[in-house]
Amino acid sequence: MDSRPTIAEVDLAALRHNYDLVVRTIPRGCGILAVVKADAYGHGFMDIARELETLGVTAFGVAFLAEGIQLRKSGIDRPVLILGGVYPGQERKCVGFNLSTALFSLEQARVLDDAAGRLYRRARVHAKIDTGMGRLGIPHEEASAFFSALRELKHLDLEGIISHFASADELDEDGRRYSDLQASRFAAAVAAARHEGFEPRYVHIANSAAAFGMDLPFCNLVRPGIVLYGALPSGDFEGKMALKPIMRLRSSIAMLKWVEPGTSISYARRFTAPDRRLVASIPVGYADGYSRSLTNRGEVVVRGRRAPVVGTVCMDWIMADVTHVSGVTVGDEVTLLGCDQEGNCVRAEELAEWAGTIPYEIFCGISKRVPRVYLNPSIRHR
C-alpha cells in the first residue's frame, strides 16, 4: 500500500439515519432537495448522491453547472437544481443536460429562454427571490413585476420559486423575528407568481435550520445540507437533533518520543514542554484540512482518551501530548474528527469552535489527498 494511514471514513448508515430524521421531522408530503454542492460538503458527492437516490430523495442541489453535469454523467436522473445559477454561455448545456437552474434576473431569464428555444426545449427554472439574504435574487419588492414579465417568455418552465434564510439558525428573538419577516416576504412573492398564472411545482426556502425549526405551510420542499452530514446548523440546536456524524477522519501514530522539560515542539516553538512529556507524531496536517488554527487548541482521541495537539500544525504532521494515555504505542489509531469504535468523538462543532470557524468549513476543508472510504452502503447501493 502506497498511501499513509490517514483516511476519511464516510458511514452511509449514519447518512441514512440523518435523512430519516429529516423525513420524520418535515410535514407529510413535503419533498427533500438534498444539498450536495462542494463535493457533498467534502464527503464525496457521487457516493452520497447515489445513496440518497436509493432513499427516494426528491432532488439534488448543486452550486454550479459542472457539478450538475457530473451527477448526470454518473447516472443520477433525479431533478438537479443549480443553486448558484448559470453563467453566460452555459445556458445550452444546462438545458441539454436536463438541469434546473436558479434564476435571479430578467436578463438571465431572457438569455435562457432564447437558448431553450434554439434547442426546441423548455428551460426549467426556479425564480430566486431575495427576501433579506442580500446575496442573490430578484428583490422581493419587484417580484410582481418580474413574474408579469416572465409570462412573455414561452420557453421557460417556472418549476419552482426559491429563497434563502439569512439567520434561521439563530433561535433568539431577533433571529426568529427576521426569519419570520423573510417568510412573509416569500409568501407574498409566491402569491404574486400565482396571481400571474404560475403554479410552481416546488416552493422552498427552508435550509437545515428552518426544516427543523420553522412552520412553513406554503412550502412543499426543504433543502437540508449540514444536518445530512451529521452536524448542527448552530449551537442553538444543541440537544434538539439526534444526528449522527457520518465522517470520521483518522490516522495513526507514526512516532513516539519522550521530551524533557524546556523542549520546544514544531515551527515557531509555540509549545514548550513544562515537564517530561510523551509526544506522538501523527501524519496529518493543514494540507489535509486539519487547520493550522488548531495549533495548541485541537484535541484527538487515542485509545479512548482525549489528547491535546501541541505545537504548530504542519503541512503534513501534527503532534499530540499522549503522556496520560496508558499503553499507547506506535501504530495506535488516532481519531481527529468523528467517533472511534467505542463512541469517543471529536465533533465537527468542537473543531470549528477551536479553529474559530463553522462545521461547514471543517467538512469542506478535508482535502482531496485524504482518501474517502465508504462504509455500510445500502443493499440497493451495492
Swiss-Prot record:
Annotated active site: K37 (proton acceptor), Y267 (proton acceptor)
Swiss-Prot/TrEMBL catalytic activity: L-alanine = D-alanine
Residues found modified as N6-(pyridoxal phosphate)lysine: K37
Keyword field: Isomerase, Pyridoxal phosphate
Iron found in the keyword field: no
Keyword Repeat: no
Cofactor(s) of this protein: pyridoxal 5'-phosphate
GO molecular function: alanine racemase activity; pyridoxal phosphate binding
Binding, substrate: R135, M315
NCBIfam families: alr (TIGR00492)
Protein name: Alanine racemase
